[in-house]
């Protein structure tokens, strides 16, 4: 807010003069309706936006070209304040068309393909529209917009201010903004490359009545609002020639406005007719002569003012020519610099390309050497793997042979063990059968002996009982006789015989057992010898 105060203080006088001139013209023409001023003091400084708050209601093709242009991304990015953007407009803007001259190829295309609505092929977007979108990014206030449309240095600053209003403000407020400037006669060339000079008033009338602006479109105005604007414009016809006092007053106002905008002043001093008339009336006593003199002075004043206007126009033309020459020179310098830079860049690129090619060749050589070494290593590895596989095969064959021999040995041993087990089983069966037969014979013998002994014992007991019964008195004698009998040699002989028989029987049994054992040992000793012989014979055959 504080940065914009100097620009507004110097422009307050032209604003009030323009508003007063419009009111006087309406009263003289008979327009009874009172119009609203462009900006009232009661309104706030915050300026509301209408439509899309991100794209500023611009055509998408133009917006994408603005955002992708290096001028907007690099140079305008450094501008941060309102005054810096205004200075950039003063030095860079030469037309108000959206595209630069010759950048869009639309020859032979008609309708929508011709780019009438901005949907054709894009081109180089103009600096004017880049700066217009930069103003939109700054979010201008009401006072800043008024400073743009009443600026005194360049008509292109005013034109961009009016375009900002046309794109961002509601359609119902456009008449309030543009009404006091519809008769503004400041000239500007709006076409790229020149050839389309119009005044500020004519440009504003086209803004209000037409949607097309060269190869783009303004935001659409609703039908009732458009009808209202058309009716109000019909009541305000554009005045081409002005006669009498009204023309003089308009010329005076226009000259005052020019003087307030330009620092230079005209050579003829401004004098009011009342003061000249009063002075001449006091000097000369005759009123007719004073009136004639006053008329002559007024004619001279008008002539001088016309000459001053012509001089101002010539100065403007010379200034515009000088500006054009300066711009062309600066552009030619920039082109020369850009060409020299491009040449330097091309040389640097060539050197870089050569270095890159050399590095690539070195890398290729390294890769080739590495591939060769790698191939040699692979061949060595293959030979080693082949040798290892041969060794492993030979080892595997030897191990397989050993394994087969071990298996055969195990089979022979198992066969021998099985044969031994079978032989031992058969021998054990024979032994068991023999032992059973022997035990049976021994049992029979023992049974027969026990029967004999029992029968003998019974007989003896019977005899003893008979003897005891017979000789009860002769007990002692009988006992003595019995003792004698028992200790008689026949009795002892019989006992000795029985004992000798038992001993002989035991000896026979022991001898039989020893013979069986010896036979078993002989068979066991013979079997391993036979097995060893068989194994040797098999080994010899293998």
Swiss-Prot record:
Its GO biological process annotations read:
mRNA processing; RNA splicing
Q: Which domain of life is it from?
A: Eukaryota
Biased composition annotated in UniProt, kind: Low complexity: 13-24
Query: Does the record bear Translocase in its keywords?
Result: no
Indicate where this protein is primarily found.
nucleus
Q: Where is the composition biased (Basic and acidic residues)?
A: 243-255, 291-327, 345-418, 449-466, 479-492, 499-522, 530-542
Q: Which residues carry this modification: N-acetylalanine?
A: 2
What this protein is called in its record is: Pre-mRNA-splicing factor 38B
Q: Please tell me the species this chain comes from.
A: Rattus norvegicus
């Amino acid at each position: 807010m504080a940065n914009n105060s100097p620009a507004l203080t110097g422009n307050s006088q032209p604003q009030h003069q323009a508003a007063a001139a419009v009111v006087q013209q309406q009263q003289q023409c008979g327009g009874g309706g009172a119009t609203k001023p462009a900006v009232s003091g009661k309104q706030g400084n915050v300026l509301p936006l209408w439509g899309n708050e991100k794209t500023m209601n611009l055509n998408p093709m133009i917006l994408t070209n603005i955002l992708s242009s290096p001028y907007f991304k690099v140079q305008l990015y450094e501008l941060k304040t309102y005054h810096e953007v205004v200075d950039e407009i003063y030095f860079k803007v030469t037309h108000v068309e959206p595209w630069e001259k010759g950048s869009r190829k639309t020859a032979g295309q008609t309708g929508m393909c011709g780019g009438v609505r901005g949907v054709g092929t894009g081109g180089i977007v103009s600096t004017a529209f880049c700066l217009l979108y930069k103003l939109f990014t700054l979010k201008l206030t009401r006072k800043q917009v008024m400073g743009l449309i009443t600026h005194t240095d360049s008509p292109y600053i005013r034109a961009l201010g009016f375009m900002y209003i046309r794109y961002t403000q509601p359609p119902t407020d456009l008449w309030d903004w543009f009404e006091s400037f519809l008769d503004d006669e400041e000239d500007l060339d709006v076409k790229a490359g020149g050839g389309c000079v119009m005044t500020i008033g004519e440009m504003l009338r086209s803004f209000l009545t037409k949607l097309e602006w060269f190869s783009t479109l303004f935001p659409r105005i609703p039908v009732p609002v458009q009808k209202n604007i058309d009716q109000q414009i019909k009541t305000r016809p554009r005045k081409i020639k002005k006669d009498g006092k009204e023309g003089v007053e308009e010329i005076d106002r226009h000259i005052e406005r020019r003087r307030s905008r330009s620092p230079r002043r005209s050579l003829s001093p401004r004098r009011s007719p009342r003061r000249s008339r009063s002075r001449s009336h006091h000097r000369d006593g005759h009123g007719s002569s004073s009136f004639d003199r006053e008329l002559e002075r007024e004619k001279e004043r008008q002539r001088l003012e016309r000459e001053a206007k012509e001089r101002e126009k010539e100065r403007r033309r010379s200034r515009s020519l000088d500006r054009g020459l300066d711009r062309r020179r600066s552009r030619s310098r920039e082109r020369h610099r850009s060409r020299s830079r491009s040449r330097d860049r091309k040389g640097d690129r060539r050197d870089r390309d050569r270095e890159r090619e050399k590095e690539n060749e070195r890398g290729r050589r390294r890769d080739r050497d590495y591939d060769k070494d790698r191939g040699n290593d692979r061949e060595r590895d293959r030979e080693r793997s082949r040798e290892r596989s041969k060794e492993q095969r030979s080892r595997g064959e030897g191990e397989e042979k050993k394994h087969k021999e071990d298996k055969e040995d195990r089979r022979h041993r198992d066969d021998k063990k099985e044969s031994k087990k079978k032989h031992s089983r058969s021998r054990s069966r024979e032994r068991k059968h023999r032992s059973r037969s022997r035990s049976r014979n021994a049992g029979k013998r023992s049974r027969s002996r026990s029967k004999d002994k029992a029968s003998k014992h019974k007989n003896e007991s019977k005899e003893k009982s008979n003897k005891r019964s017979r000789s009860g008195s002769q007990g002692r004698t009988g006992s003595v006789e019995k003792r004698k009998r028992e200790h008689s040699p026949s009795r002892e002989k019989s006992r000795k015989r029985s004992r000798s028989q038992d001993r002989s029987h035991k000896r026979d049994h022991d001898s039989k057992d020893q013979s069986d054992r010896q036979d078993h040992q002989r068979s066991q000793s013979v079997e391993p010898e036979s097995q060893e012989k068989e194994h040797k014979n098999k080994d010899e055959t293998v």
